[in-house]
């Protein structure tokens, strides 16, 4: 029967030799016919239902329902790369600034950035991960992290704090196009996008680049050796308008010349809004003008 099978399974695991510490055995019930692990109840057969992992000087509580990189040493390389992309040579560049960590999971990146900025706001749709993020922040003595449970697309309309920097670490399918639009509307000068699926990344980058952002840096981290999977870190920056030289023309007194009124950014935005009912960002207008 099931109890005898589980008892034998537990015994087989406990009597083996391990280099590390054996923390626990959990039995997750799943009677679904689908090829997916759907939790219908979890039973602790031995030990604890969690363990602690240390990463870049911080401590994280990991549960079966927390998203955390399986390759811990590789995760240190990944997050150190992301931190270097964000801070660059100026370690005080985020001093006094607000950072958004969107799709924040258990808040790993948010907590790595918290010591060097005023506040980090993490948004994650999985409530268990948000609870773990709050617990981990308290564990690490970080009081400037705020984690919100909800869909990024909806939560962005509710957050009062405006970001100075945005970090993106979405699931494999990437970012919803409408969410990308809202992210771009903030007009932050720099962003870092961490992706685990190159095709989703390529699709999303096309949207960012069409709206005025450009790729400054890109780095791939081989988190899963001997597989085709790879994590990619991309730094995006908002394109600056091309430098202009101001020229003043003063026609002769006898001339009948009247300067033609030019379309300003505000007039273009007003025209598009009236004619098509669409709000356009200044950076998008600048991109079209350059084309």
Label every PLM stretch briefly:
Residues 1:
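Carbohydrate-binding surface patches
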Residues 4-257, 265-266:
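Rossmann-like S-adenosyl-L-methionine
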Residues 213, 277-278:
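Short aromatic/hydrophobic-glycine micro-motifs
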Residues 264-276, 287-291:
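DNA-recognition alpha helix
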Residues 284:
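Residues in the helix-turn-helix
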